[in-house]
């Protein structure tokens, strides 16, 4: 007979009740700080709506009017060195954290005026939302993308759930760097249904990450009620299976939020581990703008009226007065302080003519400034002499696969900020393909196996990179990068630019192309053209062990995200590397002419190099001289057009050889760029050799048909050599 034994969840969820004595225990100083923040946030966001109505704000304005108790309570409970990450509805979180950071020690709003530094924070926040040059990000981030790393504002994020992995990575970095700072990641009820949240919550529990996942449950994801989106209504229950304890609080009461946050931080500093706080709160207006939700029919006026009675802007001061913790005069002082601060911010950002506000021309950013900060503009290679094979005299043998492991290990020896993470990297005697061999023995504390959670570990690596580490991430097959697309491209690839160049993501992603192994259409992607769509990424493709070491060293030194493309068929290929050093750098953006010729320029990379060299050798007997160039750098910004151009001017003909299907290849855009730059030197259009436009099949015969062969490349070279494309 079967027996069913109840299994208890590995964590617990509590609901918090707050009593009058809790208010008194908090003390008048912190209560006044919370109330001051409430008034400032409300005045700030009311001003935003006025400016939007006056057409002085471009883009959406998502206010948190009604939800201010959350931001005020959390910010008051945190230390200056703690950090917060937020959402598209971030004005309150951002402003509260910035003001508490820039306030002098012991600041008491019932006694002290807002300081110039605090006023500057308000001014810069308003300027950013208005798209002005004096904003935190130079105006390019706006309402949904606010960033100020100094004050612990990790950045607000317009992708629902998109900031959670990054915040988790920052918190993980605090632990690895032996700091006791806590990170709070704010997100709404809608984000609880995003897979990225569940991936990183599980990893945060596995790794003991000091982060508070703060769910602002305002019951509506735009107009979708939480009971339409989640079977479980108390969202804090959903992380119990990950072993994460949680508490549910009244999100309209700043004291409840403060106490829950303070207690979680205290436990976390003593024993780093994630925690979930769910605040039941309410936004009085629709998703964006000034209209109420009832105007759109997804909730009733009666419901809105019930929640309006709980509005913290009126309920909280009333409660404090009833307990003798606030006088009417003190209340009026805090209200006046908020109004005065916003009046000054408006005067900073606008002027008035004929009774109408306008933005003076000098407040706008220079249009051409938008071209800056896509990538790091610092000279990180100052004093470095780049090397090529010809610069060395003594060598030793090494395979491509050995070079990957050796270069990684050497960089970990040189820089304690370098960590390695990915699936199986600490297993199987050096990872699934030997690329991390020796690292577990040398640096077990900096080598991290991950779950099969590409979104999670990619985003966590991005957050850790922004916090000062230099992660090396292995994505086992390039196709799996599609699972992590939001983190790799919307986040890591864009945020430097969106935040005005104030953040860096110095991480390396390694991935192994498996074309030719019979893995089929979901494990055989060459992702070069995909990564090249996002200009924040640098792309390197070393075709031999010597180049791998030099380019890996270069990649780790960058303050930008770099993807290194490898090919499985190269792993066993032997090469010669310097006998007495691994500390050399190959210049990013520098292609390598491997064979000189005069009739056709052949551009290729990775396994295409050997095939093109063989085809060129065979063609030589037929009187056609091909110049073969290993591109090495594949992103369009870093492409070595100087070397390409010098060759084109000599040959008058170009052939691009890739293993990708035509629609997933670099060749289309690269050919267009070459024809635009060197049109006068070309005798014919640019030729292309790629796989046909199909997912690569498993069948050996079918896959071999798809992959460009030496014979097919030779045939195309011959046409190009005769300038007949």
What does each of the following model-derived ranges do?
Residues 46, 131-148, 235, 427-442, ...:
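Acidic-glycine-rich active-site phosphate/pyrophosphate-binding loop
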Residues 46-49, 54-207, 225-231, 236, ...:
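Cofactor-binding active-site loop characterized by glycine-rich and histidine/acidic residues
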Residues 64, 72-80, 96-106, 431-442, ...:
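Glycine-rich loop at the start of a catalytic domain that most often binds anionic cofactors/ligands
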Residues 126-128, 205-215, 449, 493-511:
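A glycine-rich helix N-cap at a beta->alpha junction
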């Amino acid at each position: 007979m079967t027996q069913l034994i109840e299994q208890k969840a590995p964590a617990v969820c509590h609901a918090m009740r707050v009593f009058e004595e809790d208010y008194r225990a908090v003390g008048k100083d912190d209560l006044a700080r919370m109330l001051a923040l409430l008034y400032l946030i409300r005045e700030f966001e009311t001003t935003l709506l006025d400016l939007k109505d006056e057409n002085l704000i471009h883009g959406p304005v998502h206010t948190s009017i009604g939800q201010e108790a959350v931001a005020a309570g959390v910010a008051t409970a945190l230390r200056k060195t703690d950090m917060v990450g937020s959402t598209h509805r971030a004005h309150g979180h951002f402003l509260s954290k910035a003001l508490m950071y820039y306030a002098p020690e012991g600041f008491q709003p019932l006694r002290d005026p807002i300081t110039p530094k605090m006023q500057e924070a308000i001014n810069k926040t308003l300027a950013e939302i208005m798209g002005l040059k004096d904003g935190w990000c130079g105006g390019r981030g706006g309402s949904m993308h606010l960033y100020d790393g100094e004050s612990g504002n990790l950045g607000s994020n317009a992708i629902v759930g998109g900031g959670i992995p990054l915040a988790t990575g920052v918190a993980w970095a605090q632990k690895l760097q032996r700091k006791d700072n806590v990170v709070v990641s704010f997100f709404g009820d809608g984000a609880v249904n995003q897979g990225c949240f569940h991936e990183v919550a599980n990893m945060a529990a596995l790794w003991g990450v000091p982060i508070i996942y703060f769910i602002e449950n305002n019951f509506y994801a735009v107009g979708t009620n939480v009971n339409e989106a989640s079977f479980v209504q108390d969202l804090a229950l959903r992380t119990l299976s990950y072993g994460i304890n949680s508490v549910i609080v009244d999100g309209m009461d700043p004291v409840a939020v403060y106490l829950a946050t303070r207690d979680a931080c205290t436990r976390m500093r003593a024993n780093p581990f994630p925690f979930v706080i769910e605040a039941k709160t309410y936004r009085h207006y629709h998703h964006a703008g000034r209209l109420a939700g009832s105007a759109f029919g997804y909730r009733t006026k009666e419901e809105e009226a019930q929640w309006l009675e709980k509005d913290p802007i009126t309920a909280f001061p009333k409660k404090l007065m009833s307990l003798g913790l606030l006088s009417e005069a003190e209340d009026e002082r805090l209200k006046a302080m908020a109004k005065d601060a916003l009046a000054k911010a408006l005067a900073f950002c606008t002027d008035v003519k004929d009774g109408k506000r306008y933005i003076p021309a000098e407040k706008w950013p220079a249009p051409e400034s938008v071209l800056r900060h896509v990538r790091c503009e610092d000279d990180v290679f100052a004093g470095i002499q780049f090397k090529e094979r010809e610069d060395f005299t003594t060598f030793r043998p090494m395979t491509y696969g050995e070079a990957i492991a050796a270069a990684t290990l050497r960089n970990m020896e040189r820089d304690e900020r370098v960590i390695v993470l990915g699936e199986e990297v600490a297993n199987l005697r050096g990872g699934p393909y030997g690329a991390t061999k020796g690292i577990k023995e040398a640096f077990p504390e900096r080598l991290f196996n991950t779950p099969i959670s590409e979104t999670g570990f990619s985003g966590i690596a991005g957050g850790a990179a922004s916090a000062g580490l230099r992660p090396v991430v292995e994505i086992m097959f390039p196709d799996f990068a599609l699972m992590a697309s939001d983190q790799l491209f919307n986040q890591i690839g864009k945020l430097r630019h969106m935040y005005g160049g104030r953040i860096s993501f110095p991480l390396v992603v390694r991935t192994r192309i498996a074309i030719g192994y019979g893995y089929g259409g979901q494990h055989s992607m060459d992702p070069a053209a995909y990564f090249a769509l996002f200009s924040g990424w640098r792309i390197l493709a070393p075709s031999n062990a010597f180049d791998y070491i030099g380019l890996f060293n270069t990649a780790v030194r960058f303050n930008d995200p770099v993807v290194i493309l490898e090919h499985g068929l190269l792993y066993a290929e032997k090469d010669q590397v310097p006998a007495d050093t691994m500390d050399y750098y190959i210049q990013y953006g520098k292609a390598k002419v491997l064979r000189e010729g005069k009739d056709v320029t052949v551009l290729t990379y990775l396994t295409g190099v050997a095939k093109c060299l063989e085809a060129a050798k065979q063609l030589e007997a037929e009187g056609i001289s091909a110049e073969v160039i290993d591109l090495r750098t594949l992103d369009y910004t870093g492409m070595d057009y100087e070397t390409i151009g010098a060759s084109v001017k000599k040959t008058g003909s170009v052939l691009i050889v890739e293993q990708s299907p035509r629609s997933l290849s670099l060749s289309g855009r690269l050919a267009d760029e070459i024809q635009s730059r060197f049109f006068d030197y070309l005798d014919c259009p640019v030729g292309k050799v790629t796989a046909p436009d199909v997912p690569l099949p498993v069948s050996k015969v079918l896959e071999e048909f798809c992959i460009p062969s030496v014979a097919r490349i030779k045939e195309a070279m011959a046409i190009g050599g005769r300038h007949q494309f």
